[in-house]
Amino acid sequence: MDELLLDLFHKLTSGRQLAAGNGLCGISHKEQEVWKPGHNILVKMRKEDKSLVWLIHSTLARYTQVTNFLGTSRSSVTRCKPGANCPSSHSGISRQLSPLSVTEDSSAPILELQNQGSSGVCGHRVERQNRSADDGTQTHSENSSQENRIKARCLSCTSMVLKGIWGLLIILSVSSSWVGTTQIVKITYKNFYCPFFMTWFSTNWNIMFFPVYYSGHLATAQEKQSPMKKFRECSRIFGEDGLTLKLFLKRTAPFSILWTLTNYLYLLALKKLTATDVSALFCCNKAFVFLLSWIVLKDRFMGVRIVAAIMAITGIVMMAYADNFHADSIIGVAFAVGSASTSALYKVLFKMFLGSANFGEAAHFVSTLGFFNLIFISFTPVILYFTKVEHWSSFAALPWGCLCGMAGLWLAFNILVNVGVVLTYPILISIGTVLSVPGNAAVDLLKQEVIFNVVRLAATIIICIGFLLMLLPEEWDEITLRFINSLKEKKSEEHVDDVTDPSIHLRGRGRANGTVSIPLA
């Protein structure tokens, strides 16, 4: 730029000297060809010959314009983003073919590279920061979700373990109470045979079911309720209005009669048959419940339960055949089957009219049955006493210990059945009931009251298998298929692992020997 100014200054001074030498006093005009900065065309400008000061000022103005042009070109170059097309390359204005334009063109790529480098580094830093922030939040969310999953699994595992423990205890308690009730009845029959009085006496103990439930409520509940308030809350099983006299007679009477009839027939069967046979035949009530539910309630038809019902009927016939169709044996089988049938009818009617009930409602209902039995059924043992059908000499001669033990175990059995539904799985209650069969068999063998032949043993096993088939859920076939498919997948995965392990071993040996072996697998 300095050289350009000196050039212009020498030309102007030489022109002024030439004009003075020629004696030109007027205004002389001189044509000069110059490159105008920032344009592509050659501009011819005529300027008047003025004073040196005016030329210097004009030259300084030109210098200022050239400097501004350089600033704008640099800013336009440095503002170009990496990878983008610079607008100066597409504009209609080209650079001057001068040393200044050459230096500008040569410096532009350097500026662009510097700008690309700086912007690229900054971009990479920003991207790395964003990625690290995203990775941090994602890792934190994954860790929190994984912790929540672990906690949920631990809670579910804990609840399953607790339910399993409670289920095991309730299975043992249910089977023990039922075996104890049956064996105490057999012992009582040696000195006292009044089955209806025993049924009436044990049913009266059901009144204590609700007080036992309320005692548990006071011991475990955080918000205590008064007995009347809790009684009214549990009486909703009879309807929104609670327990009225009309509902008491309408709902309680048929269920109380069925309850009494079930227990009375069971006690009659124990007089004719052994405890093992009666308990095995009573397990047929599951098959009768399915048949009545299918006919009355229009429940889903299941082929496996039909098979279980057929097995139960087969076991009944074989049990009657075990003693060569002896009269007492046939009558005892009829009593036991009648007890199982009335029990099934009780359950089906309860489901039809009252639906499902929680623990408090069940306690209220059973206590109501005991209260109805005490008021309305008490005349029956009185009539049997005076007609000498069930007669005893005096109340002091009654076996009160056996009677209270039988009634207490029967009440415990009913409480455990309803508590078990709350604390554990309902299927375990049924398993506890069917386990009473081998329990009674063990006691009978110890007492040497029964000799098991092949027919009786086969009948007992068939009835128990049919009872267990009744416990299968409705989607048992789908669950079985899923289980089989999962086993197949596990076997296939193990086979793949067994195939890949030798390949890894071969690769390790090949690399150790300096060669690479490719297994066929």
From Swiss-Prot:
Residues spanning the membrane: 160-180, 192-212, 248-266, 277-297, 301-321, 330-350, 365-385, 395-417, 419-441, 450-470
GO cellular component: membrane
UniProt keyword list: Membrane, Transmembrane, Transmembrane helix, Transport
Domain EamA: from-to ranges: 261-321
Database matches in Pfam families: EamA
InterPro entries membership: EamA_dom (IPR000620), Solute_c_fam_35_mem_F3/F4 (IPR026505)
Membrane topology according to the record: Multi-pass membrane protein
Subcellular location: Membrane
Primary localization class, coarse: membrane
Functional description taken from the UniProt entry: Putative solute transporter.
Family: Belongs to the SLC35F solute transporter family.
Protein name, as recorded: Solute carrier family 35 member F4
Organism: Homo sapiens
